[in-house]
Design a protein with these regions (language model features):
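Glycine-rich active-site loops that engage anionic ligands at enzyme catalytic sites
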Residues: 2-228
């Protein structure tokens, strides 16, 4: 089988390779997501970081041959489905509570944007987002495009910890932290649903090629969903 995807593999350091596409008519994030999954399943002890327009691969230059890895990557692209650009496969609605207890940076967001609380919430949840990529932590979904009216830069001083389900905004993206951990984005709310669970057949609830809609809920609804 001959690969239908013209890729370029660049050496960016002695232990890092970067895979790029020459073709711009396909869904870049989904292509690199598929390739990363094929690489992980091949059990070749490679670390992969899929991005929106490239894939970075880390290997051990002492134990692994760079040229053999390149050849393996070319072969793996042969089994990737043709990811047509802008073709979304499924839609998911994610409930969000924007109460102060969960919206840790709402005050700063209001000051930065000059909008009212209701307007900020409306700008965030009254639109459809595309899953651009998965990364940073297991299941973290980068969603776009965020409304221009509530675009903020990343935090100058990232938080060392936010609870799982926290929803952040930064630049033209919004994202959900599926597990507790550090966060460099402004936290606008939190969802009670479990986005990453290793006990599920598919541990990730949100995947590339999905469309996502946020739905505002009250604190009592949040707590009820958390108990279910």
């Amino acid at each position: 089988m001959v690969s239908q995807f013209p890729i370029v593999i660049e050496e960016i350091s002695e232990d890092l390779l970067q895979v790029k596409l020459k073709e711009n008519k396909i869904d870049y994030p989904y292509f690199f997501w598929q390739l990363s999954q094929h690489i992980l399943k091949s059990q070749n002890n490679l670390e992969v970081v899929p991005g929106e327009d490239s894939l970075v691969i880390q290997f051990n230059p002492v134990l692994q041959d760079r040229e053999e890895i390149k050849e393996e990557i070319y072969k793996l692209t042969e089994s990737i489905d043709a990811p047509v650009k802008n073709k979304l496969e499924r839609s998911i609605t994610v409930p969000v509570c924007y109460d102060n207890e969960f919206a840790l940076d709402m005050k700063n967001i209001l000051n930065h944007t000059g909008l009212s609380r209701r307007e900020v919430i409306g700008e965030h949840c009254h639109r459809k987002y595309e899953v651009k990529m998965i990364g940073f932590t297991p299941g973290f979904a980068y969603l776009g495009e965020l409304s221009e009216k509530i675009k903020l830069p990343r935090l100058t001083n990232p938080r060392p910890f936010v609870p799982k389900g926290s929803i952040g905004i930064a630049n033209n993206r919004t994202g959900i932290y599926p597990i507790q951990g550090p966060a460099g984005w402004s936290i606008i709310g939190r969802t009670p649903i479990n986005l990453f669970d290793t006990k599920r057949n598919d541990p990730f609830l949100i995947l590339p090629r999905m469309e996502l809609i946020f739905e505002q809920i009250t604190k009592s609804e949040f707590n009820a969903m958390l108990r279910d």
